[in-house]
Curated annotation (Swiss-Prot):
InterPro entries: MetalPrtase_cat_dom_sf_prd, YbeY, YbeY_CS. Binds 1 zinc ion. It is found in: Cytoplasm. Zn(2+) binds at residues 107, 111, 117. The keyword Transport does not apply. One of its GO terms (biological process) is rRNA processing. Keywords: Cytoplasm, Endonuclease, Hydrolase, Metal-binding, Nuclease, Ribosome biogenesis, rRNA processing, Zinc. Its cofactor is Zn(2+). The keyword Secreted does not apply. This is Endoribonuclease YbeY. SUPFAM superfamilies: Metalloproteases ('zincins'), catalytic domain (SSF55486).
Length: 142
């Protein structure tokens, strides 16, 4: 029997896969979706750059790429997250790696739930949702 959510880590960095599973599942359930089939791949810049170039025509690495094949309220899709980009973002935004990893994972799940970030108003709505979910999963560092 296959699992509805499969997580693959192609890097040497250790990840708390059970926490990532909980984050993705919670976001999608609370947005009104069930996971039919979802693959989450945590990779490096080299892999995500290749995917970005081949499938989206963008010749640069990015933090996340999401592909949705969903119909209705059942999620069928995949997302890729570059841990190199997550690390760069964490330094840029002066947050911990784990917090930024949660944010990008939430961001990916929100894309699967239909949220977009191409326009300013869409980006603001998505950032508000990210902040809402992030508060639940990240303990503020003091």
């Amino acid at each position: 029997m296959t699992m509805p959510l499969q997580i693959y880590n192609t890097t040497r960095r250790e990840l708390a896969e059970s926490v990532l599973t909980e984050v993705v599942t919670t976001v999608l359930q609370e947005e009104g979706f069930l996971i039919e089939s979802l693959v989450a791949v945590y990779c490096g810049n080299k892999m995500i750059h290749r995917i970005n170039r081949e499938f989206l025509g963008h010749d640069y690495p990015t933090d996340t790429i999401t592909f949705s094949y969903s119909k209705g309220s059942e999620i069928d899709g995949e997302f890729y997250i570059s841990l190199d980009a997550v690390e760069e973002n964490a330094l840029r935004y002066k947050v911990g790696f784990d917090e930024e990893l949660m944010r990008v994972t939430i961001h990916s799940a929100l894309h699967l739930a239909g949220y977009q970030d191409g326009k300013d108003e869409e980006r603001v709505q998505m950032q508000e949702k990210e902040a809402l979910y992030l508060k639940r999963f990240v303990t503020p560092s003091t």
